[in-house]
């Protein structure tokens, strides 16, 4: 006789992790823990720890951590500067991949010639002529 199967649904495990993991990460005891040796030595296994315990808003970095491929050292350094600075870094992180490539090709002008862009000039007295 085979014992009854005790498979736990994937959704139940995910729900349990979502309910238990945030309080454990945000508890005062977790924040007061000393920095692990791997982080002092700056090894690759510490990237997630740095994202979770560093300063600033790291939601975008955590969500894209598994999708990122190792890039050139310059790109990695720029990402580290974005993550370690204070403030909201979502816009900088999300557009970083686009800025790393070459300059976009100039867009062709519609019609026979490009329209001239008018630059507003300042009238005497500091007022604009508009």
Curated annotation (Swiss-Prot):
Disulfide bonds join 38-44, 39-46. InterPro entries: Orexin. Residues 97-130 form a propeptide. It comes from the Eukaryota. The modification Pyrrolidone carboxylic acid is found at residue 33. One of its GO terms (cellular component) is cytoplasmic vesicle. Specific enzymatic cleavages at paired basic residues yield the different active peptides. It is found in: Rough endoplasmic reticulum; Cytoplasmic vesicle; Synapse. GO terms for molecular function: neuropeptide hormone activity; type 1 orexin receptor binding; type 2 orexin receptor binding. The modification Methionine amide is found at residue 96. Transmembrane segments: none annotated. The modification Leucine amide is found at residue 65. Belongs to the orexin family. PANTHER family: HYPOCRETIN NEUROPEPTIDE PRECURSOR, OREXIN. This is Hypocretin neuropeptide precursor. It comes from Canis lupus familiaris. The gene is HCRT.
